[in-house]
């Protein structure tokens, strides 16, 4: 299972002051995703391949063991759609985490499953 996370959408789903430090908020999300790489997510047992898609002010977030970071040159949604298409071409099941309805429509056209931000925010993010 490939878990593709729309970082901007997931970080923005909780009004916790993320707008003051987008990179820091995205790094906290990245760190929380490490557990999902080992344990799995939303009915999909681990291990899973976790891909965090970043853009804008969070483009410089570095990967960590268990979480691959993909920085979008332009639209994060376009990159997520491309990654979902690659997963389909590779025959890899894919779950995209976002609340963005249009993005959900685009990735399901590639056969991806979708889940909301709560799927990966079940635990408090590290501070």
Predicted regions mapped to residue ranges:
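Nuclease catalytic cores that cleave nucleic-acid phosphodiester bonds
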Residues: 2-4, 11-127
């Amino acid at each position: 299972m490939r878990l593709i996370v729309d970082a901007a959408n997931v970080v923005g789903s909780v009004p916790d002051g993320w707008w003051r430090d987008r990179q820091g908020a995205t790094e906290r999300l990245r760190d929380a995703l490490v557990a999902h790489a080992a344990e799995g997510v939303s009915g999909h047992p681990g291990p899973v391949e976790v891909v965090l898609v970043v853009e804008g002010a969070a483009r410089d977030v570095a990967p960590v063991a268990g979480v691959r970071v993909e920085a979008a040159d332009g639209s994060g949604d376009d990159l997520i759609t491309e990654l979902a298409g690659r997963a389909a071409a590779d025959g890899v099941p894919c779950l995209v985490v976002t609340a963005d309805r249009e993005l959900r429509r685009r990735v399901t056209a590639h056969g991806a499953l979708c889940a909301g931000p709560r799927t990966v925010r079940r635990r408090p993010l590290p501070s």
